[in-house]
Structure formats: structure tokens, C-alpha cells
């Protein structure tokens, strides 16, 4: 994909930098999968478009990525994204991403068949989660907030994040083979799935006030309920550290453990879980903490792999 690295950098500089630490055989597939997922996320979050329009486009994008769509459907998808959704994006990188969505699909189709299959599976699952979100909450109007059941939230976190942990595991196992992990593939799939769900739970907990202002409430504000979700998030992030500890490849260990530590640091920020108002600036882990964690991750990467947390 011509200019793919530049496009990825414009969409997410932090993700672009983290890609550089991955083993060579994973970089292209992870980059393409990320851009396709980010494009779907941009569509799902475009509040200027009605939920009906977004749902229709997400289903069309799913057909395109999974290879079901014919040539006319593909052309219609690319045209609608570039004409109807891209101009309304406030993020310049996302605007260009939607305009060049067809190139991202072409880049995916140029990958080895096994990698294409993995990307199609994870993107289909992610879009299922985004569709559920839009169908459940609709266009989101303050004052008409619904809260899904625990089972719904768990399924949602799997679809939009847990499946990414599985994708990461399956791709790394495919590329690295016996040099992937000291644990079995099945154990790593479970750890990776929970790791992804834990990261998504951190996002949900952190963004409660902002989501409520958009008519979304994924979890109740009752103290006991919040405490249970917080405990689950910490436990699953701990599984993320265990996942990373079991990896053999040093580059992969470095890239894999950082999000878990950043997630735990996020949960420890003052007031981050107290339901502050949406008008307040979103709290983030400071740069000095990120640098400290990167040094810690570098040292962590050189340790011998461990088969348990």
C-alpha cells in the first residue's frame, strides 16, 4: 500500500511507533487490520450521521472486508465513505483513512491467505460489536439512557476487544510458530481474549461520564457494581501481563506488556473512576510515566519467558 506507513502515522502516532517493535512478519497484517478497524470505528462514532446510515455502512464494510460484496457493492462502499462520511471527520487522519479505505482493503487482499483469513474474522467480530452498540443505544439522547445487562457488556467487550487479543495470538503463533510462547495456544488464546476485554473495560470505566452525555451507559454507577467491574478489569489486565510473560520473542513481549501496564496506571489516576463530568478534560497517563513504563518494558522483554503469572 503506497503511503501506508504515513497514513497509519496520521491516524495514530502511538500505534505507528509500537508497530516498529513487532516481529517483521506481523507488521503489515497488524497495520492493515488496525486501519480497517479504525475506519469502522470512525463510521460507528460519526455522530453527524444517523444510526441508520452508520449501521448500513458498517454492514456494507463488513461485506467488503469478508469478501462477500460484489464489485458494485465495493465501489458503492468506497464512494459513500469518501463522499458522505469523510468530510465530517474532525480528525484529519480519519478523514483521509475513509477516503483511502479501498486501498486498505486492497492491501489486505495482497497479504498471504492465512493472514487474510485472520483479519476477516477479527474485523467481522468487531463490526458485530459496533452494530450491537448502535442498535442498543441508537443515536443516543441524554435523558433516555439504557444500561445493558452484564452478559451484554461481556459479549460487547469480547467483540470489540477480546477478539483482538485472539487475533494477535493467532497471527503471532502463525508467524513465530514454536518460538511464540511457552504456554499452549489454547492458554494464550484465553489470556489474550481476557487481556483485550480488560483494556476495553478500562475505557468503559474511564469514559462513563462522557458516554452518559451521549446517551450511553454500559455499566451501572452503583458502588458495588462498579467495584466488581473494576476488580474484573484489574484481573484481566493481570492476565495481560501473564500473557506477555509467556511470550518468547523479545520484541513481542515489549509491545504486548505496555498496554497492560498503561491500563493499570490509568485505573490508578486520581478520580478516574469517580464519574467526573464529561466537560472535564479526559485524564491520561503522563509522558514521564509512559517513559518509565517503556524502560520497564524493555527490561521485562529481556527476562526469560514464564509459564504462569
Predicted regions and their residues:
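Catalytic cores of Mg2+-dependent Asp-rich isoprenoid enzymes
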Residues: 1-199, 205-309
Amino acid at each position: 500500500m503506497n503511503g501506508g506507513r504515513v497514513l497509519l502515522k496520521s491516524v495514530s502516532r502511538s500505534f505507528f511507533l509500537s508497530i516498529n517493535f513487532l516481529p517483521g512478519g506481523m507488521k503489515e497484517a497488524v497495520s492493515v487490520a488496525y486501519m480497517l478497524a479504525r475506519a469502522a470505528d470512525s463510521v460507528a462514532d460519526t455522530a453527524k450521521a444517523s444510526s441508520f446510515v452508520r449501521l448500513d455502512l458498517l454492514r456494507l464494510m463488513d461485506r467488503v472486508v469478508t469478501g462477500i460484496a460484489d464489485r458494485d457493492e465495493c465501489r458503492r462502499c468506497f464512494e459513500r465513505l469518501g463522499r458522505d462520511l469523510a468530510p465530517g471527520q474532525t480528525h484529519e487522519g480519519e478523514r483521509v483513512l475513509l477516503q483511502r479505505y479501498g486501498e486498505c482493503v486492497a492491501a489486505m487482499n495482497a497479504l498471504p491467505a492465512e493472514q487474510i483469513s485472520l483479519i476477516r474474522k477479527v474485523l467481522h467480530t468487531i463490526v458485530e460489536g459496533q452494530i450491537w452498540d448502535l442498535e442498543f443505544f441508537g443515536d443516543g439522547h441524554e435523558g433516555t439512557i439504557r444500561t445493558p445487562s452484564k452478559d451484554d457488556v461481556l459479549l460487547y467487550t469480547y467483540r470489540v476487544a477480546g477478539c483482538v487479543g485472539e487475533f494477535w495470538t493467532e497471527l503471532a503463533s502463525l508467524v513465530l510458530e514454536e518460538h511464540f510462547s511457552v504456554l499452549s495456544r489454547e492458554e494464550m488464546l484465553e489470556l489474550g481474549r481476557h487481556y483485550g476485554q480488560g483494556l476495553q473495560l478500562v475505557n468503559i470505566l474511564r469514559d462513563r461520564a462522557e458516554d452518559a452525555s451521549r446517551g450511553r451507559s454500559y455499566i451501572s454507577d452503583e458502588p458495588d457494581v462498579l467495584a466488581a467491574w473494576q476488580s474484573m478489569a484489574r484481573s484481566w489486565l493481570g492476565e495481560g501481563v501473564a500473557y506477555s510473560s509467556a511470550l518468547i520473542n523479545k520484541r513481542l513481549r515489549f509491545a504486548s506488556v505496555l498496554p497492560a501496564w498503561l491500563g493499570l496506571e490509568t485505573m490508578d489516576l486520581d478520580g478516574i473512576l469517580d464519574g467526573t463530568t464529561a466537560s472535564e478534560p479526559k485524564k491520561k497517563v503522563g509522558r514521564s510515566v509512559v517513559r518509565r513504563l517503556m524502560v520497564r518494558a524493555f527490561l521485562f522483554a529481556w527476562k526469560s519467558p514464564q509459564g504462569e503469572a
